[in-house]
Each structure stands twice: as C-alpha cells, then as structure tokens.
Design a protein with these regions (language model features):
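A structural signal for short coil/turn segments at secondary-structure junctions
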Residues: 24-27, 87
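Charged catalytic cores and adjacent phosphate/nucleic-acid-binding surfaces used
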Residues: 39-90, 97-217
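Single conserved hydrophobic/aromatic residue that forms the stacking wall/gate
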Residues: 1-8, 12
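Glycine-rich, aromatic-flanked loop segments that form ligand/cofactor-binding clefts
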Residues: 28-39
Length: 217
C-alpha cells in the first residue's frame, strides 16, 4: 500500500542519514546523505542516472523526489530549486553517461525541445559536477569521438551488457559535452555543460579496493 511504501521509505531515509553521520570523521572521511534518481526509459536507452547529494544531514526533506513523481530531469531540478528556497542545499551528479545512448548531454531537453536559456540555467544551478570515471568505465571520451587521441580508449566500455556495440556515442561523453556547451555559448545560449568532474567507485558502500586483483563492488 501507499502507507507501507511511505513507511519503508522513511525507515530507509533515517538509516541513510544515520550511516552518513556515524561514518563522518572530519579531515579523514567525509560523508553525505543522498540517493539515486533515475529517469531511464529502458535499461540502455536514455540510461540516465543521477546521484542527488544533500549538503548536510540536519535538514533533509521528509519526501524526496523520485521517478514516480516524474522521469523528466528538469522536474527534479525544479524540486531542487524549491527546497533550496527553503534552505535545503543539494546538487545532482549525472553518472554512467557513457551508456546513456546520447541522452546525458543532448542538445535537446528530455521532451525533445531545443536546449534554451531556462534549461541551461536550471542545469547550471543544480548539476555543477559530472562523474567522469567509475566501475562501468570512463566517460571522458571514446576513440570514435577523439580519433587523434591515442589514449581515448582508456577504460571505455565496448558494449552494453547483452549488446554487441555501443550506440549514440555523441552526447554520452564529457569532452563532447564541453564542445557542445561551447557551441551553445557561441549561439548566445548559456553553456549548460560548464561542469567540474569527479571519479566514483559505484560500489554504493563508500569504499573500494586498492588493486585490480581485489576489486569488489
């Protein structure tokens, strides 16, 4: 039931907050409370995942925004703008862009319309970072996109699980996004892809291994 679902969500939220608070060691290990939002349509078609991270654990909304509210990332940004006005600071970090099928850094919005100033500013406010590498490979660039770069094949996925080849490489990689952003800026639209980069493990446990031989996830 809806009541049972809400109760389970509340328990999970409290457990997440407690885990972040318990593990936090200033100057040694920094933790944040957050969750994963997905607007994926199919498994590897518009595979869009974002990690939503809250600035602190003392002021987190009772109900978080999920794909049940909307699969449109702009609606997530609207929600983040709304809670920011109430004093709740957060950011969203797109990850796994390398298997997004070109959707992560598209020149169109989720509904197919062209990127405009409203879209660009909302994205800039809410997504200042993008994940460039993790266990599923790097999202910097691909040999087909950077043909003169002999290192462009570093840790890139060659196919999706269950598929023979990757498709729609343009719009899936960070370097390509930077170029697209500069193109939009040249056309007089704010650059929505002016972001910094992070690396992650995607282990979902805040840990990883030191060597490839003992890698775990």
């Amino acid at each position: 039931t809806q009541a049972e679902s809400s109760a389970a969500s509340d328990v999970y939220k409290r457990q997440t907050i407690k885990a972040a608070d318990d593990a936090y060691k200033p100057g040694i290990f920094t933790t944040f409370a957050g969750y994963e939002y997905t607007s994926s349509v199919d498994l590897y078609d518009r595979y869009l995942h974002r990690n939503v991270i809250f600035k602190n654990t003392a002021n987190i909304p009772d109900v978080i925004f999920s794909r049940l509210d909307s699969q449109d990332p702009e609606k997530l940004w609207d929600w983040m703008d709304g809670i920011r006005e109430e004093g709740v600071e957060s950011l969203a970090i797109p990850h796994n862009s390398n298997i997004s099928g070109g959707s992560a850094f598209s020149m169109n919005d989720y509904n197919g319309g062209p990127v405009d100033e409203v879209y660009a500013n909302k994205r800039l406010r809410n997504e200042p970072l993008v994940e460039i590498t993790q266990a599923k490979g790097t999202s910097e660039t691909h040999p087909f996109l950077s043909k003169n770069d002999e290192w462009a094949n570093f840790e890139v996925p060659t196919n999706h699980p269950g598929e023979n080849v990757l498709t729609n490489l343009s719009g899936s990689y960070v370097r390509d996004a930077y170029l697209r952003g500069l193109t939009l800026a040249k056309e007089g639209i704010s650059n929505p892809f002016k972001f910094g980069i992070i690396g992650s493990s995607d282990t979902h446990v805040g840990g990883g291994s030191y060597t490839e031989e003992t890698h775990f996830s």
